[in-house]
Swiss-Prot record:
Residues 6-20 are annotated as: Repeat 1. InterPro entries: Clp_R_dom (IPR004176). Induction: By heat shock, primary alcohols and monocyclic aromatics, and weakly by catechol. Belongs to the ClpA/ClpB family. It is found in: Cytoplasm. One of its GO terms (molecular function) is ATP binding. Keywords: ATP-binding, Chaperone, Cytoplasm, Nucleotide-binding, Repeat, Stress response. This is Chaperone protein ClpB. GO terms for cellular component: cytoplasm. The Clp repeat (R) domain probably functions as a substrate-discriminating domain, recruiting aggregated proteins to the ClpB hexamer and/or stabilizing bound proteins. The NBD2 domain is responsible for oligomerization, whereas the NBD1 domain stabilizes the hexamer probably in an ATP-dependent manner. The movement of the coiled-coil domain is essential for ClpB ability to rescue proteins from an aggregated state, probably by pulling apart large aggregated proteins, which are bound between the coiled-coils motifs of adjacent ClpB subunits in the functional hexamer. It comes from Acinetobacter calcoaceticus.
Amino acid sequence: MXFEXFTNRLQQALSDAQSL
């Protein structure tokens, strides 16, 4: 798993959390 993919996944999780 590349670091970029990890950050991308983390960013998406943060966006989802802000949506709540």
